[in-house]
Amino acid sequence: MPAARQQRGAAVEAAARAQLEQAGLRLVAGNANYRGGELDLVMRDGPMLVFVEVRYRRDARFGGGAASVDFRKRRKLVLAAQLFLAAHPALAALPCRFDVVEASGEPPLLHWIRDAFRLDDC
């Protein structure tokens, strides 16, 4: 991945994290890499464990970032979440949800989609 694209991704993830923290969520982990995929942000929203996918699109004409979280990507996120929970058994009993923060434009505008998909969507 080109350096400029990596920097943009890191900046958008940091902005997403800041927005979620301002809304009261607390960071548990960031950029957690597993065999099946990566979890951009893992956060707590009260008793809820939240797996957050952050997606940036420079231009939203062809669907925003959330549109790129297709069936295949959702399956990878679920697998990564399962591996995360296996590695952190103290968190495994918490209720979980999957959120998406999509960003588009320059400067990026963020849109937080709570409960963007459920396990039965995978």
Swiss-Prot record:
InterPro entries, per database record: Restrct_endonuc-II-like, tRNA_endonuc-like_dom_sf, UPF0102_YraN-like
Protein name: UPF0102 protein XCC0710
Homology family: Belongs to the UPF0102 family.
GO molecular function: nucleic acid binding
Source species of the chain: Xanthomonas campestris pv. campestris (strain ATCC 33913 / DSM 3586 / NCPPB 528 / LMG 568 / P 25)
Gene3D superfamilies linked: 3.40.1350.10
Top-level lineage group: Bacteria
